[in-house]
Amino acid sequence: MSKKATIIAVVNQKGGTGKTTTTENLGVGLALEGKKVLLVDTDPQASLTVSLGNPCPDDLSPTLSDLMGKIMMENPITPDEGILHHPEGVDLVPSNIELSGMEVALVNAMSRETILRQYLDTVKQNYDYILLDCMPSLGMPVSYTHLRAHETSLH
């Protein structure tokens, strides 16, 4: 039987409400309890990526944008591709400003709501929890994140 990670999206339409801090602290807390945790930075501002010790997110590769692009092009990805390991016991899929361009590409993509789901399906067997740090919006990107966070959304 394959393991099914609990997926939690941390969302709010406003910026500066503590989404990133909540995502990071919840993730580290779960890791301290012995859980395998993946944090996914779905915000082009990359606050979670920076907060976890990556001060130049534009220099990172691959990022969430790159991984989603590969899925859109139907190129294979491996379950550990693009994942950074943090000393506090959490893993991170980083983001950067390129994710803004991915939002534009998703507008015209077939089955755009499945792109993030396809990525998460690739990695979920390796984790107990996957936490999604969402951008401040109720537009398309957040609604697609909600589609994937079938377990819980924190507002």
Explain the meaning of each model-derived region.
Residues 1-154:
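P-loop NTP-binding core
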